[in-house]
């Protein structure tokens, strides 16, 4: 009996980050009770961390990002590693609390970056869920689009800043 419970649990947990895994993410409810905020997170330049410092450091980065996500969001929602360097949080919080939690996450990640020089930046997008106005799937897609929009914007600004420095 204990083995069966352990086996079921390990099928739902990502072994590296100890967050819920993609299987759990894909079996999440199609609707949520009340308002929620869905965050999509992606580790910036993760491939270069792996290529430069090795997969051991890359794994440590993912574990640290997962730990930071859990520390900030676990009391208000579900935290998932959905694959590679992508994470999702479904938080049962109000729209007005969304910025507060995002700020807390970024502050915590910055504090951890001081201790771990390999910890890169994380791009985050989020969208608010209102059961009477949209589906969970639509909100997830919006959050994902916002995250990629932010990531492209950062790369564009970095290129512009580098071009300015070179000239």
Language-model segment annotations:
Residues 21-37, 44-74, 80-84, 88-89, ...:
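Conserved long alpha-helical elements within nucleotide-processing catalytic cores of c-di-GMP signaling
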């Amino acid at each position: 009996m204990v083995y069966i419970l352990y086996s079921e649990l390990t099928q739902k947990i990502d072994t590296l980050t100890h967050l819920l895994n993609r299987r759990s993410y894909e079996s999440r409810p199609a609707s949520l009770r009340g308002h929620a905020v869905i965050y999509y997170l992606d580790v910036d330049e993760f491939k270069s961390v792996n290529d430069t410092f090795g997969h051991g450091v890359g794994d440590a980065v993912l574990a640290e990002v997962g730990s930071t996500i859990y520390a900030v969001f676990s009391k208000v929602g579900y935290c998932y590693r959905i694959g590679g360097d992508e994470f999702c949080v479904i938080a049962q919080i109000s729209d007005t609390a969304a910025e507060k939690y995002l700020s807390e996450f970024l502050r915590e990640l910055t504090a951890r970056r001081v201790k771990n020089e390999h910890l890169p930046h994380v791009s985050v997008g989020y969208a608010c869920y209102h059961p009477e106005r949209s589906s969970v799937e639509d909100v997830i897609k919006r959050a994902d689009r916002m995250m990629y929009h932010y990531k492209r914007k950062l790369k564009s600004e970095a290129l512009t800043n580098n071009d300015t420095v070179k000239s």
